[in-house]
């Protein structure tokens, strides 16, 4: 009996072990990933709705769209070979290769000026002797009207790449070209002036009398604010040098060197040397100058205006007349009773600050000897003004840029003639103004 019981016990044990083994064979073991998920699902607390929203926000901020960086526009290259310029079929390529301010090729409205190039081009650089009228560039399948701005130095980007362009002149006035060149597609290279139109509103509006006064007296100030602070500097010249057209080119070259990019405004007063304010007033009159100045002030709405020494620096009567009228024009520009027809076009403007060169009250000494970070050549405002004056070839030997405190040519000394925003505490002409806005 005992042996039978033992046998049954052995059989039952074997069966039990076999069953357990079978169960083990059919049970699927979780993978490592499944094990982790299972653990998280069993241990993590249930998220609230707020936590869910926060998670969604976090996830949304992490997911970003790919950023596509636009390649900068290339710098255009001058095409020096394989170019042919003809005027009514006559080759004038060599004459127009480089500007000579003492000569130009006259062109009548009935004539045809054409530029062709073996290398496709997308821009033209033109230097005119005098301000041109309207003209049209024409090529196979397209055209572009130009000349509305009247730029003497004009960089024109074409809407497509071409190999040949002809000029069609709109007016009966005579044209005269000093330089014409073709360029590949891109922004204007160094040495090519791509002027912007006169600005909408100016941070600084300077009122020099002649071409070169902007450099001699205001050059350090203009260079600093135009280059280092990248402010909008607009210039308005009282005289037009109608009998010395080369000085108009010198003016553009000097302004460009000082970092000015908005095309200058030029008045209609003739350049005429006078020895006193009264002599200048007898020649020009007061009202034409006042009206012109009020127009510029209301148009450009400057934060700061810069004018000549009331004594005319070295006694030039036109300098004196310019400033004598300017201090009145600043007041008139804010008064609706003065020149109301100009107010209808531009509105009124009360200029926050007016500085005059060498004015002794509320004096300021402007720093022209600090190297400008934004100047590629690492120059100071004084050095830039000196380089700009080199552009005034016709005036070489007469004057020079100076910071001699005992000289009437000193470009560092100014006085705050009028202010609506308080007096200066440092050497910054733009102090207390909303510069760059």
Annotate each predicted stretch with a short phrase.
Residues 1-10:
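Bacterial N-terminal signal peptides that target proteins for export
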Residues 12-17:
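Hydrophobic helical h-region of N-terminal Sec-dependent signal peptides
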Residues 26-72:
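N-terminal, intrinsically disordered, polar/charged segments of Gram-positive cell-envelope systems
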Residues 79-87, 91-113, 119-123, 128-134, ...:
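Active-site beta-strand->loop->alpha-helix modules in alpha/beta enzyme cores, enriched
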